[in-house]
């Protein structure tokens, strides 16, 4: 009985390996050592070299000072460019054309417009029916 279980387990593992290997795309399949060496040498020549340098404390301080100067200068420019804004006028107690005018809202601003409601008074808007009133 143990031999049968061992055989079935081996068969199951081999089938799992076969299905996983057959579903790999061609570029994911393992290659031989020669092709790997050729690809790695070509990749090294194609990519640009990158050098990483550590910053010392002095250069960090200089960059922080430069950043603070930039912040200060931008704040000064922003404060100089501020212009007195005109006061916003209170909106008139009316609804502009094509805006919502549901019943508790005031009347339409345009004398030729009227409030039209659709879909059981759920969507209402001010519309101009005729240009000549």
From Swiss-Prot:
Query: Which keywords does this Swiss-Prot/TrEMBL entry list?
Result: Disulfide bond, Glycoprotein, Knottin, Secreted, Signal
Major localization listed first in the record, in broad terms: secreted
GO biological process, alphabetically ordered: hormone-mediated signaling pathway; melanin biosynthetic process; melanosome organization
Which regions are flagged for Polar residues bias?
37-50
So which residues have sugars stuck on them?
A: 38-39
Q: Where in the cell is it found?
A: Secreted
Q: Name one GO molecular function term.
A: melanocortin receptor binding
Q: Where is the composition biased (Basic and acidic residues)?
A: 26-36
**Signal peptide from the UniProt entry:** 1-22
Ranges of Basic residues composition bias in the record: 70-79
User: Which Pfam families is this protein grouped with?
Assistant: Agouti
Recorded GO cellular component terms are: extracellular space
Annotated segments matching region Disordered: 26-83
Task: Note the SUPFAM superfamilies from the entry.
Answer: Agouti-related protein
Which residue ranges does the record assign to the Agouti domain? 94-133
The UniProt entry, under InterPro entries, shows: Agouti (IPR007733), Agouti_dom (IPR027300), Agouti_dom_sf (IPR036836)
**Cystine bridges:** 94-109, 101-115, 108-126, 112-133, 117-124
Return the domain comment text from this UniProt entry.
Answer: The presence of a 'disulfide through disulfide knot' structurally defines this protein as a knottin.
Function, in words: Involved in the regulation of melanogenesis. The binding of ASP to MC1R precludes alpha-MSH initiated signaling and thus blocks production of cAMP, leading to a down-regulation of eumelanogenesis (brown/black pigment) and thus increasing synthesis of pheomelanin (yellow/red pigment).
Q: What is this protein called?
A: Agouti-signaling protein
Q: Which organism is it from?
A: Equus caballus (Horse)
> What lineage, starting at the top, does this entry show?
Eukaryota, Metazoa, Chordata, Craniata, Vertebrata
């Amino acid at each position: 009985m143990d031999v049968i279980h061992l055989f079935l387990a081996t068969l199951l593992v081999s089938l799992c390996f076969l299905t996983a290997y057959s579903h790999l795309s061609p570029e994911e399949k393992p290659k031989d050592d020669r092709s790997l060496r050729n690809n790695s040498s070509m990749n090294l020549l194609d990519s640009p070299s990158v050098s990483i340098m550590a910053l010392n404390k002095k250069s960090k301080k200089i960059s922080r000072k430069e950043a603070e100067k930039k912040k200060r200068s931008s704040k000064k420019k922003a404060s100089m460019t501020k212009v007195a804004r005109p006061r916003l006028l209170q909106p008139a107690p009316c609804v502009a054309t094509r805006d919502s005018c549901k019943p508790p809202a005031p009347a339409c601003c345009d004398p030729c417009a009227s409030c039209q409601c659709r879909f059981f008074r759920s969507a209402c808007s001010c519309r101009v029916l005729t240009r000549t009133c």
